[in-house]
A protein has these predicted regions:
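PLP-dependent amino-acid enzyme catalytic core
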Residues: 1-317
């Protein structure tokens, strides 16, 4: 076990930030004391929806762009292109606006149109891709995502763009290894026993798990998937049209998770995720989406079983 050598939490009250990207990360950690008062244990919620783009994806967006600049893969004036369910695109729109790159977000029509409007307001070009004929409107499936991938690949070739690929680029995982993980340890006074995360690209789960396991191998880390879309766990995959956006894409292998040792897989139903999201708002004043609800629902399952009496951390994104 090792301790972080110095604080990684930025005290933004001590200086004027040069631009909005300086406000990414160092988000608050809050105990869900009202929500979990009948639970045997604690749930600590990392409020990453307080990032400038309202999600944890701001961290990955910034790190991917910084890495690409450093390596020379991204040159001044080059167009940045990436597929998104909304959050990654918003983060990239912010970072590209500040650092001077045109940005194209490619998005399924099954995703939130509010996010598309937000990205356009920040200067992004948004390309919307129709869902498959047998898809449920508003519920993005694996085949829907493949359509978005195909359009993204074509646009990168046509525009000579830089693909800010959150599924492949190491910056996604590194953002959470260098930021979210150390912040969780420091803010919790090293009291975390477990961590669980709803998996989209896998970057958050991979980066946080890698840091926590290096810090203390006894900390248990879990992947969260939708009930019936359990590709990582090798379980059922007969419900691709679940309502938990941002993950559950039926991808059994994710680059970010290669070599990452997980302690288990948790499945959460639509109704469990939705109910937890509603209760977060009603009981804790935390207004978040269904993926955040899935994280909290999974943490509750752990506290009612193998991790009773422990402290579980989640990200509210």
């Amino acid at each position: 076990m090792h301790k972080p050598k110095e604080s990684r939490i930025i005290d933004r009250n001590q200086s004027v930030l040069p631009d909005i990207t300086g406000a990414i990360g160092s988000t608050p950690l809050v105990e869900l004391s009202r929500f979990g008062k009948n639970l045997n244990g604690r749930i600590l919620a990392k409020l990453d929806y307080l990032n400038p783009g309202f999600s944890k994806k701001d961290r990955a967006a910034l790190q991917i762009i910084l890495d690409a600049e450093s390596s020379g893969e991204l040159v001044p004036g080059q167009t940045v292109i990436e597929l998104t369910s909304g959050n990654m695109g918003t983060g990239l729109a912010i970072v590209c606006t500040i650092r001077g790159y045109p940005f194209i977000a490619v998005m399924s029509r099954g995703n939130s149109m509010e996010r598309a409007r937000m990205m356009r307001a920040m200067g992004a070009e948004v390309v919307l891709v129709d869902q498959c004929h047998d898809s449920v409107p508003g519920q993005v499936s694996g085949p829907d995502l493949q359509r978005v991938e195909d359009v993204t690949t074509r646009l990168v070739a046509e525009r000579g763009g830089f693909r800010a690929d959150q599924f492949l680029l190491e910056g996604n995982r590194r953002a959470h290894y260098m930021g979210t993980g150390p912040e969780l340890v420091e803010q919790s006074s090293d009291s975390i026993d477990g961590f669980c995360d709803f998996v989209g690209s896998g970057g958050t789960l991979a980066g946080v798990t890698q840091f926590l396991k290096e810090h203390n191998p006894a900390i248990r880390c879990y992947a969260v998937e939708p009930d019936g879309a359990e590709a990582l766990a090798g379980g059922r995959t007969d419900t691709p049209g679940h309502r938990i956006q941002g993950g559950g894409y039926l991808k059994p292998h994710l680059c970010a998770l290669a070599g990452i040792k997980l302690d288990g897989y948790l499945r959460v139903s639509d109704s469990e995720a939705i109910q937890c999201a509603r209760e977060l708002a009603a009981k804790e004043g935390i207004f978040a989406g269904f993926s955040a609800g899935a994280n909290v629902a999974a943490a509750m399952k752990l506290l009612r079983s193998e991790m009773a009496g422990k402290t579980i951390a989640v990200v509210i994104c």
